[in-house]
A protein has these predicted regions:
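Extracytoplasmic copper-binding redox domains, predominantly the cupredoxin/blue-copper superfamily
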Residues: 16-131
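Bacterial N-terminal signal peptides
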Residues: 2-11
Length: 131
């Protein structure tokens, strides 16, 4: 392998190593009917993975708040969300143990609110902070 090939391979390896997986649990506390994302605030970079996992209280979903999003940010989030059920919305996660992965797209630094549609009335919400 030539020098250029080694440099390119090193760059790819460094980028892959820099990717962080953030695990977010979607859960319910049956004692007080509290629904939540845990953690509820995630600080990430473009390329990181958000792994949402239903622990209890299904069904759940992940919906990014459209209010205040630029058209570019909205398009980037929609493109990053596989199997969307609607604009900025994951499919419904109907069983405990279900997972949903989002690779953080190139977004401007800032805060991006999200919530669980079935439990929005219970204030099940979170925030993605882009560095």
């Amino acid at each position: 392998m030539g020098l250029l090939g080694m440099v390119l391979l090193a760059g790819i390896s460094a980028a892959a190593a820099a990717q962080e997986v953030h695990q977010i649990r979607l859960q319910m506390n049956a004692r007080n009917d509290e629904y939540r994302f845990s953690p509820s605030t995630i600080t990430a970079r473009p390329g990181d993975v958000l792994l949402f996992r239903t622990v209890s209280g299904a069904p759940h979903s992940v919906v990014f708040e459209p209010k205040g999003l630029s058209p570019r940010a909205r398009d980037a989030l929609n493109s990053a969300m596989p199997r969307r059920s609607a604009d900025l919305s994951s499919p419904l996660l109907t069983e405990d143990g279900a997972e949903y992965r989002v690779v953080v797209p190139p977004l401007p630094a800032g805060a991006y609110a999200f919530y669980c549609l079935p439990h929005r009335a219970y204030d099940m919400r979170g925030e993605l902070r882009i560095r």
